[in-house]
Curated annotation (Swiss-Prot):
GO terms for molecular function: membrane insertase activity. One of its GO terms (biological process) is protein insertion into membrane. It comes from Tropheryma whipplei (strain Twist) (Whipple's bacillus). Coiled coil: none annotated. Keywords: Cell membrane, Chaperone, Membrane, Protein transport, Transmembrane, Transmembrane helix, Transport. This is Membrane protein insertase YidC. The lineage of its organism: Bacteria, Bacillati, Actinomycetota, Actinomycetes, Micrococcales.
Amino acid sequence: MFDGLFDFLQNILLPIKWVIEQILVFFHTLLGFLGFGDKSGLSWALSIVGLVIVIRATLIPVFLKQIRAQRKMLEIAPEVRRIQEKYKGKRDVLSRQSMNQEMMEIYRVRGANPLSSCLPIVLQMPVFFGLYQVIESAQNAGTGVGPLNGPLGMDFRDSRIFGVVPLHDSFSHDFYALQAGQAFNLITMIVAGVLTAIMIAVQLFTQLKVIPKNIPENAKNTSVYKNQKVMLYLLPIMFLGMGFSFPVGILIYWTASNVWSAVQQAVAIYRNPSPGSLAFELRRKRLGVQNKKTKGQRQQPVNKRRAKRR
């Protein structure tokens, strides 16, 4: 049963892995023209960053849809809270069904979809697993399903960041080697730790400084906002697990993707904030200052004779 499921997932990821390899090789070739060596670990690391740029740029329309969905959820949050208060303490099946029906009706009328905000993450997961398998395949056999084959696949496998950190190495691999008294790569552990720290710092900055500015005051007591605060504590724990377990190449991808998300959120909130939020008021002040400068009445020059008569 599990073998069949594994083969099914492998078949789904096959075209994704092929596309990932094409993008990696494209950026690796481009960086080669710019003076990076064929076996340079930095070249392959930057190629992974290039993969992030391509994937996230492709998902910009989905991100904009996510922003609209989040805004809709915040707009209807007071109505959802009223329904929850209406059925508070009622645990019978009929009451729960009635509550769900009323909430679904609000979602339908207002055009909101609670699942739309998860779409960018869901669409990135196949790329994440595809890249993981590309790195694993390169480590085990030096062969891929696309252009990462033959000598190029060997170069990808043998590349080292700073000359010592393989893309397929992980913190956990060297940590267990250290515990067993075997040879381990301290630089890999340091690089993995730094990348994990950057991931957590960027995520905390986004959750604490960027997103709260875009939440209206009347929505801060809703379950939607409380769920976001829960994620504030869960995501760093998840990132710690990722930093411990996943290869350095995956950590590069996820760190670059987190930085992209933070910048994208900040730009979207700056240009199109939610009504009633702090970011919205700041934008109004910015526009008000600009309007005062541009809409001021032009004073006509007065010649000397007219000035003397006055």
